[in-house]
């Protein structure tokens, strides 16, 4: 029974460590890929802009808030009603300080779980008294790893979440959740698009070509 419990503890702790390392690695790898492919993407977009002169509808939204699904649903509906509109979507970047705090928590989570798994006491290394909570965590490794994992993830989400759902048409803002406080329903968005497209057509008619 003791052997089974020890094996289960080691397996659970190893799982937490692997998931945490994967979380950090995947996040870093995606950022690196975006940076490496950035010039190519920008070149492709510039080439598309040289051939495409129609309206461009751009969404910037909070991915961690679950707005990716909303963007996909709205994109399908808008494409059916306005097939000439090109739709783009991207994550709304958090503030730099929040981004750095989120990255710090990712590494802190990994370090905390690694110390719990190996049984190391960082307080003794610095000549400090061991807090009771750390001694309790060593006696309850699975539960303490759970707490470190989920609390760190909760704080990461808090710092990286912007709550944004911003919409621009030809680089002109037509909706901002950060200002209005809510995401428009699809009918509201249709009405907004219709009004702006009519205004753009009227402006083109008022300026005759030379």
Swiss-Prot record:
Protein modification: May contain a selenide-sulfide bond between Cys-62 and Sec-65. This bond is speculated to serve as redox-active pair.
Single annotated GO MF: thioredoxin-disulfide reductase (NADPH) activity
GO cellular component: endoplasmic reticulum membrane
Domain of life: Eukaryota
GO biological process: cell redox homeostasis
Leader sequence segment: 1-21
Annotated tissue distribution: Widely expressed in the embryo.
Keywords: Redox-active center, Selenocysteine, Signal
Cysteinyl-selenocysteine (Cys-Sec) cross-link, chain position(s): 62-65
PANTHER family, per the entry: SELENOPROTEIN T, SELENOPROTEIN T2
NCBIfam families documented for this protein: CXXU_selWTH (TIGR02174)
Family: Belongs to the SelWTH family. Selenoprotein T subfamily.
Protein name: Selenoprotein T2
Species per Swiss-Prot/TrEMBL record: Danio rerio (Zebrafish)
């Amino acid at each position: 029974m003791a052997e089974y419990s020890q094996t289960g503890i080691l397996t659970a702790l190893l799982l937490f460590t692997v998931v945490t390392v994967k979380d950090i690695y995947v996040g870093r790898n995606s950022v690196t890929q975006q940076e490496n492919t950035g010039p190519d993407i920008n070149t492709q977009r510039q080439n598309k802009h040289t051939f495409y002169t129609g309206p461009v509808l751009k969404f910037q939204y909070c991915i961690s808030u679950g707005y990716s699904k909303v963007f996909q649903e709205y994109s399908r509906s808008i494409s059916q009603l306005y097939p000439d509109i090109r739709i783009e979507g991207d994550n709304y970047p958090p503030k730099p300080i929040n981004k750095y705090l989120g990255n710090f928590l990712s590494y802190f989570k990994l370090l905390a779980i690694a110390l719990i798994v190996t049984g190391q006491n960082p307080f003794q290394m610095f000549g400090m008294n061991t807090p009771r909570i750390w001694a309790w965590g060593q006696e309850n490794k699975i539960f303490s790893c759970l707490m470190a994992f989920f609390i760190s993830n909760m704080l990461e989400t808090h710092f990286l979440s912007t709550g944004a759902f911003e919409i621009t048409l030809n680089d002109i803002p037509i909706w901002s959740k950060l200002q209005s406080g809510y995401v428009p329903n699809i009918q509201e968005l249709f009405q907004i698009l219709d009004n702006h497209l009519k205004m753009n057509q009227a402006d083109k008619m008022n300026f005759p070509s030379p």
